[in-house]
């Protein structure tokens, strides 16, 4: 279990038939030798229709830690954030001590009526705290357009003979 170093302090007191010297305390540090867990996405891509209201992306640890694990994330892609296509800003995910996963949620996916290409939301992990970054550090979520293409109407001009 990855954990912080631990200390044991031994203090001598109340000697019998002796006198304590100035060195009556000893501190021993137990150095943690376990590797920090690896943090990354459990899958690197997924998709859903515009009618999906939100999508939770799972971030996993390779092992539980006795310390909180943090990881920053940045949001890019072809979809527009700030409520236009979805809501999710750059941020930091905290996975509490003892847990092995956390979620980053793409919220308020907008079911618009525009016929458009599929759009992507790319979430990239960086700067882990109390963990090391794994190779699956980016997740691409594709918002699949569910709108029909507009109907094409064409007109033909007819000239009729007069009688």
Task: Write out the residue ranges for each language-model feature.
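Core beta-strand segments of extracellular beta-sandwich domains
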Residues: 30, 43, 54-61, 104-108, ...
């Amino acid at each position: 279990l990855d954990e912080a170093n631990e200390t044991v302090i031994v203090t001598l007191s109340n000697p019998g038939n002796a006198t304590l010297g100035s060195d009556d305390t000893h501190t021993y540090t137990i150095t943690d030798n376990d590797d920090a867990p690896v943090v990354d996405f459990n899958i690197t891509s997924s998709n859903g229709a515009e009618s999906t209201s939100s999508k939770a992306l799972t971030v996993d640890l390779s092992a539980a830690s006795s310390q909180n694990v943090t990881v920053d994330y940045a949001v890019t892609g072809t979809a527009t954030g700030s409520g236009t296509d979805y809501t999710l800003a750059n941020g930091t995910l905290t996975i509490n001590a003892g847990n092995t996963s956390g979620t980053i949620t793409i919220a308020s996916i907008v079911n618009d009526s525009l016929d458009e290409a599929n759009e992507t939301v790319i979430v990239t992990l960086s700067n882990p705290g109390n963990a090391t970054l794994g190779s699956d550090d980016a997740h691409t979520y594709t918002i699949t357009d569910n709108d029909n293409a507009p109907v094409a109407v064409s007109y033909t001009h007819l000239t009729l003979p007069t009688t």
